[in-house]
Structures are given as C-alpha cells and as structure tokens.
Amino acid sequence: SVTVVIEPDGFLPDGILSPFIYYLGYESGKALYFNQVAVPEFWEIAGNNQFAHILEDSRERGVIHYVDAPQARLVKQVDWKDLSGRIYQADHYNRYGACFAKTTYSADGQAILTKYQDAKGQEIVLENHVTGDILLTLPGQALRHFKNRVEFTIFFLQDLGIDTRHLL
C-alpha cells in the first residue's frame, strides 16, 4: 500500500508521497543547516534551537524555520521580509538541502503563488493560491491545468496507477 499526502512537504519520510514533491525528482543531497542559507553580503544569521534570524545590520530581514527536530537546526523554510517587516516570499527546502519551492505573498500577507522547481531549477508545478489553479509542466508533455488540489491529486494517483477505489 502507498501513503499519499496532499500537503507539499520537503521532509516526508520514505514511502510517503506528495504530488507536489513527486514530479520534482529530487533524490540526493543533505538537508541544509541553518548557517548554510545563502544571504546577501554583510548580512548575518543568528540562531537558537527554535529558529534563526537573518539580519541586515540590526534589522530582521528573514526568519529561518527548522524541521520538527529543532536540535538539528535543519532548514525547512525561510521567510524573507521587506524593510517594513512584511513577509514577501517564503523559500521551502527539502531533506536534500534544495530550495524546491518559493511562495510569493501579497502586501496583506496572503499567499499568492507557489512555484515548485526540479533539481535543475525548471518550474514544474505552479499553484495559484488565489484561484486554486495548478499548472503542471512535465518534460516533453503538454502543459496540464487543474482547477484545484483534488483534481491534481486524482491525476497523480492515476499517473502512478494507484487503485483509487479504496481511498481513505
């Protein structure tokens, strides 16, 4: 039997699949340690066991969120902030140390778009959080459009040949 989750999580255990992660094809690498996050020159990272701050002079320009094992200080997400302290983008990391997705936020803090990219940096999945639409671009195939996560997940299950008659 196969376990499938709809949420895109870069740290899913072996044997658990997500349609958002599956098509990206990441297979090797090590999770990123908090002080390995790329930051502009002269910015610094200050971390503790709960999270880390990215600082420009003394201004917070980002927050690094760890995976659920906080002692490890492995990067799950980086929220980037503008000069007013508003989050404008979140970078999502996987257990291979790669930034596999980027979410863009509106001025009022609402998620607008998430772009999922493969190991080569090619955009594979685009999720519009405003409309719910999802676009899937696979190499050598026509662009596929889904109205929502349910349609996308059904396609994923069919694409893998998973029997959908016994879903929980």
Residue ranges, per PLM feature:
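Long terminal segments
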Residues: 1-36, 117-168
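Extended, small-residue-rich solenoid/repeat segments and analogous flexible loops
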Residues: 15-63
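Repetitive, compositionally biased segments used for assembly/scaffolding
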Residues: 45-150
